[in-house]
A protein has these predicted regions:
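Canonical Radical SAM [4Fe-4S] cluster-binding loop centered on the CxxxCxxC motif
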Residues: 1-26
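A C-terminal junction/extension of Radical SAM enzymes
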Residues: 189-210
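Short, flexible loop segments at the rims of nucleotide/cofactor-binding pockets, characterized by
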Residues: 20-24, 50-51, 73-74
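Pocket-edge structural micro-motifs
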Residues: 2, 168, 208
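Conserved AdoMet/S-adenosylmethionine-binding subsite of the radical SAM
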Residues: 32-44, 53-180, 184
């Protein structure tokens, strides 16, 4: 889990590491020691966050992990499209889980930053332009969200996404005041899941509240 993120999503479950200045950094040498002990037991390393692509040294870290014989995965929300393109173009990533949070017009309300939507959707296009890299496109929904989940999924499918996951937000680790549910919310999310299932993804994953 890499510290820091430029966005401020209300349902973020890793809000404790959004500030890159917090203590608790693990030395890279300690991570290499751990991987050396786990060789043959682990298939790969997933770089997550926060926002992993915020870290300038991410490419070098991925290259080192590959040298050690592990596969490389990446969780990203896509705020840095050019960095993402460089990582994929260099062949450093085997799998990407990319979060797409809303349609373009609703993005700022979710991510809390202007221009976030343009960057995220550009990043999705970059991921889908690399068919050699496995992907999972993810949408997290919550009661006070924009309610555009089907439109998000349909647009991702039009762009060529093969695997799509609908995730129901939980309140574990989220900022104070976040509400993960309301009366009838579970039924609404299940209905949305059924609608998205009609879009004919190669694989559709529903991560509900249980």
């Amino acid at each position: 889990f890499l510290q820091g993120c430029p966005w401020a999503c209300p349902y973020c479950h890793n809000s404790a590491i959004i500030d890159p200045r917090i203590p608790g950094v693990v030395a890279w040498s300690a991570l290499e020691d751990l991987l050396a002990r786990r060789r043959g037991l682990l298939d790969g390393v997933v770089f997550s966050g926060g926002e992993a692509t915020r870290q300038i040294a991410l490419g070098a870290a991925m290259a080192r992990v590959r040298e050690l014989g592990f596969g490389v995965g990446l969780h990203t929300a896509g705020p840095y499209p050019r960095r993402l393109a460089d990582l994929l173009g260099a062949g450093l990533v085997d799998w990407v889980g990319i979060d797409v949070k809303a349609t373009l017009g609703n993005y700022e309300a979710v991510a809390g930053r202007s221009g976030a939507g343009e960057r995220a959707w550009e990043s999705l296009g970059i991921v889908l332009a690399h068919p050699e890299v496995d992907h999972e496109v993810r949408l997290t929904v919550y009661p006070d969200g924009p309610g555009d989940g089907f439109e998000v999924a349909a647009r991702a499918r039009e762009m060529g996404a093969r695997i799509f996951a609908l995730q129901q937000a939980r309140d574990l680790g989220t900022p104070d005041g976040f509400a993960a549910t309301r009366p009838g919310w579970d039924d609404q999310v299940r209905s949305l899941a059924r609608d998205i299932e009609t879009l004919d993804f190669d694989r559709f994953i529903f991560r509900g509240d249980s």
